[in-house]
Amino acid sequence: MFHNSRKTIGVFLERSASEFQNRLCQGIITGAKEIGYNVAVFSDYGNYGQNHRYFIGDQTLWELPPYEELDGVVLALDTMEEIVSREHVIKNIRERCHCPIVSIRELLVGANNLLVDNSSCMEGLIDHFVKEHGMKKLCFMTGPKDHWDAQERLLCFKRKMDEYGLSYGEHQIFYGDFWKNKGKEACDWFLAEGEPQPEGIICANDYMATAVASELIRRGYRIPQDIAVSGYDGMRSTLSFTPCITTATVPFFEMGRRAVQIIDKKQDCPEKVENVFFDAVLQPRESCGCMASEGQEVMTIRQRMYETENIGQNREMQFHFMSIHMSECHTIDEVGQKIGRYIYNIEGFKDYCMCLCEGWLEKKEFKGFTDKMEMPIAIRNRENISPTRERFDRRELIPKCMSSEEPQMWFLASLHFQDLCFGYEALQFIDAETTGRLYMYWNIIIGNLLQDIMTYQKMQKLVVKLEEMYDRDALTGMYNRRGFENRGNPMFEQAKEEGKQIFLAIIDMDGMKQINDNYGHIEGDYALKKVREAIHHACP
């Protein structure tokens, strides 16, 4: 794989640019470089907006990996919101992989599981709220009911509340989504009419904590004076939020690095599995009533967030211009000429290749990837080398000209329009810090552009076909009067300009009426075709 002799680890997750996924990938890539492994990160964007056809197109990515050739697998299943995605990936891995498998943050039978020790730090969070701040009325927002971390953290909450002799009723526990979409529902539940106001809301991860805090502020509550809030995971975004969110920091980078070490250690015994637990570290901050101990770090993070926001605004504007500029393209070669101008908006990229299915212009329905792929557009070491026509075996993932004997670290995402798969794009980044900055907007623009090119070229073929229908006789295929006028006049003008002679013959077929009357129109048509053959033979 990747045209070199190194072992390759496949990483499967969703939304690689999100903070947990990004830090995990940084750890994986750092660990892989240390021992000389390749890494292929397969990352889709999920079912945003509940667009089922787009989601189907995005899911084609899970059919791209050459599972049988992977030397190790790292799974971040809890990043995949849709059950069908998780089941699809797990099925392919169980049936086709013969290598060590590592599952991050989720217990998976038959895999090495790298898990967070939820008990120790969640207990510490609850102890902090009760002992340090004297709170008794606590609510808990956990994750989905079927999620292992959500179950463990909820059990810990209940156990500690029992230890302190504190009650917890129905409206003190809410099942969230481990994302930002349930803040309003959670607050409606915790603050339901007739229920006593909570002193603190403990959330099972940081995304839900910031969603709850935002909703409380919107409703006029002060944090922490009225209601304290805490999260879990230690996302950097908790430092940029005002007030800074109390949390527990999980070492995602180290989890990624350790995953690589386990894969390397178990190359000869992939069937032997283990569970490894990582401790989280309590970070008391402003949202529970403590002063942030990381004062300088807070200022640094907020400055970075400000800079990132400015960069993001500029990138969004550039992508708008990109969409306008790319709409002028009618061929893939024209895209290659212009794409180099905008790809620098993908932070820290080094190499890029667009890999399209054979016959992608003729696709009419969803069929997935072809065994042979073509790379029409490529950027190598930040230099545009398009147009190219490199054909390669899909199992290698990229053409040989884009690889080397150095460890390869590629991120791959499918290129599609709705459920119509055109191929995929692959990016390699300069270093681990900028790893994984895939942009959904970029991907959508390219997918829509390929659809526009396909539609344009099909329309052009249709126009030519219609012109042929209007200009030629349907029976013989020879030019009719309209065709004679459209093509004859230019020929006369050319002969006149070049001083050349031109031959014009008008042929009338005698006896046509008698053939039709006596033998039928089928025989008449046959006679016309024979005359056409004679003319073509004389004037090929």
Spell out what each predicted region is.
Residues L415-E425, G436:
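Short hydrophobic/glycine-rich mini-motifs in sensory/regulatory modules
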Residues E467-N486, I507-E523, K529:
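Conserved nucleotide-binding and Mg2+-coordinating catalytic segments in signaling enzymes
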Residues Y37, F321-H325, Q460-R481, P490-E493:
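Amphipathic HAMP/coiled-coil signal-transducing linker helices
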Residues E467-E468, R481-Q501, K530-C539:
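Short regulatory alpha-helical coupling segments
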Residues E328-F369:
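Helix-loop-beta substructure at the N-terminus of cytosolic sensory domains
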Residues K400, E406-H416:
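A short, aliphatic-rich beta-strand micro-motif
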Residues D431-Q451, K458-K465:
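Amphipathic alpha-helical "output/dimerization" segments
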